[in-house]
Structure formats: structure tokens, C-alpha cells
Regions:
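A cross-family kinase active-site recognition segment
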Residues: 82, 88-142, 184-188, 271
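An alpha-helical support segment within catalytic cores of ATP-dependent transferases
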Residues: 2-6, 114-163, 173, 222
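A conserved alpha-helical element in kinase catalytic cores
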Residues: 22-23, 35-77, 84-109, 209
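Active-site acidic catalytic loop and adjacent metal/ATP-binding pocket
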Residues: 25-30, 39, 68, 146-191
Length: 271
């Protein structure tokens, strides 16, 4: 792919494509001081969600997360967070080692910030697709929608969340392990750990293991200051939400895989 014309004020050269997909393209570049950084060009499909992600990045200001250097139109200029993913740790050192690192990153992300966090997605908006499938299909979707409503009514102190933390969104570089690609959500801290139960998406053997879900929840709970059972409950709801999103995209195969994850986590909630 021919390198695109990034905003000239950034004075970036030597663009190298890192990834391209439905969300847009990501490039590594060299700035005027010879340092590497990353630029992301959002696709039209991803652009509507950009304000929440940018708001969250500005709120963290590099604490536990990639630092936003600038943004212009559909372009984002970001710190180079490194090349090693948490998935590589899982593959080489195992799930327990990867989960310990994820817990450390979560702890850093949930540390207080003096900056305001505005314009984040609400949990009500985030779970709209789940409520729609609950009305259309019932079953697990209805159960998850009911549990989601119950969790959101518990009066838990909400805070800004990454919203999409998983093994390929945690990178290691000069500043250690950092989170990238946030969604920017305002909600129960336990929800920020829930997506790790759903990942890696390629490892259905791990995702559908109830005992693994319980181990992860116990390890991640101290990082977000919530009980392991709350993480498991949100994990079930999130897996059903993911299935609903896949159905919106008419991807029934991935929806079925997501529901397998939901059913596995659901078993940990049964008395």
C-alpha cells in the first residue's frame, strides 16, 4: 500500500504499514528527531467512535496507556508502544504469566487521574445491541440483558474504562506494558476486566474453560477493586453482547462461538 499523506505539521517520514482492517490503517513513522511513533487513519466505519477513544486517551495522559500526541480529522498520532504483544507472552510463558501482566496494566489504568473524563460512552449505549437481541430472540440474550440491568443498578462507583482490553491491545516497549486502542466507556470497573475472559479470540479452548474464567477473575479482581464474581457476571454479559454485535454484522459463525464463551462463563455463576 502506498503511504498516505499524513498531516504535514507532524513532519513524519518513512511510513511503514503495520495493520489494515475495517477500523482503518496503522503506520509506524519517524519524526523530525528520528524517533518512531505510530499514526492511525480511521475508516468511515470507525470514525463515529473516535471521540470517546480520544477522550479516554487524554484522560489517561500516558498513565498505563499509549500517549496521544495529536489528532487531526480522521488521523491520530500516537506514541510507539512497542512491538511485543501480551499474546506472545501467553504463547511462550502461558496464560498465568499473561494474566499477571494484564492485572498490572489494569491496575495502572485504574489509578486516579487529575484530568476530567468527558464524552465517554455510557454502558446503556454500549449494550443497546444486546437489548435488541433480547427482544428478538430471548434465551441467553434475555438472561444477559436482565443481568446487565441488575449490575448497572447496584450503585457501584463508576469510572472511565478502556472498554476493549485484550491480549493484542497490550504492548511492551520502552515504557513497559501499555494499553492501546481504547473504546472509552464509563461504567463498572469490573467490566474492564471482563473482556480478558473473552480472549484471545483464537483460543476457543481457553475461552470456553469455566475454571480458566474463574482463575482470571480472581487474579484481576484486586486490580479493579471489585469481586471476582462481578467480573464473571460482566464476562457473561459481554460475551452475549459480542454475539449480538456479530449478529448485527451477519456473522453467525462468530456469534455462535461467542455464545459458547457465554455459556462457559455462565456455569461459574450457577449456584
Amino acid at each position: 500500500m502506498t503511504p498516505p499523506a499524513v498531516p504535514s505539521v507532524w513532519k513524519l517520514t518513512k511510513l511503514t504499514l503495520l495493520a489494515e482492517g475495517i477500523g482503518g490503517s496503522v503506520w509506524r513513522a519517524v519524526d523530525s528527531d528520528g524517533r518512531t511513533s505510530v499514526v492511525k487513519r480511521l475508516s468511515p466505519q470507525a470514525a463515529p467512535d473516535a471521540p470517546q477513544a480520544l477522550a479516554w486517551l487524554r484522560w489517561r495522559d500516558g498513565a498505563g496507556a499509549i500517549r496521544l500526541l495529536d489528532a487531526e480529522g480522521d488521523w491520530q498520532w500516537l506514541e510507539d508502544a512497542g512491538r511485543r504483544t501480551l499474546t506472545s507472552v501467553l504463547d511462550v510463558e502461558g496464560d498465568a504469566a499473561a494474566t499477571r501482566i494484564a492485572a498490572d496494566v489494569l491496575g495502572a489504568l485504574h489509578a486516579p487521574s487529575d484530568r476530567p473524563a468527558e464524552g465517554l460512552q455510557t454502558m446503556e449505549d454500549r449494550f443497546a445491541a444486546l437489548r435488541l437481541e433480547a427482544d428478538n430472540q430471548g434465551g441467553l440474550f434475555s438472561e444477559a440483558a436482565g443481568l446487565t440491568a441488575s449490575l448497572m443498578s447496584e450503585g457501584v462507583s463508576i469510572r472511565p474504562l478502556h472498554g476493549d482490553l485484550h491480549h493484542d491491545n497490550i504492548l511492551h516497549g520502552p515504557r513497559g506494558w501499555l494499553a492501546i486502542d481504547p473504546h472509552g466507556v464509563l461504567g463498572d470497573p469490573a467490566y474492564d476486566a471482563a473482556n480478558l475472559l473473552y480472549n484471545p479470540v483464537e483460543r476457543q479452548d481457553l475461552r470456553t474453560d469455566p475454571e480458566r474464567a474463574q482463575r482470571l477473575a480472581r487474579t484481576l479482581a484486586p486490580a479493579v477493586g471489585r469481586p471476582a464474581q462481578a467480573i464473571l457476571a460482566w464476562g457473561f454479559c459481554h460475551a452475549c453482547l459480542s454475539a449480538a454485535w456479530h449478529l448485527e454484522d451477519e456473522n453467525r459463525e462468530e456469534a455462535a462461538r461467542s455464545l459458547e464463551v457465554a455459556q462457559a462463563i455462565r456455569r461459574t455463576l450457577e449456584v
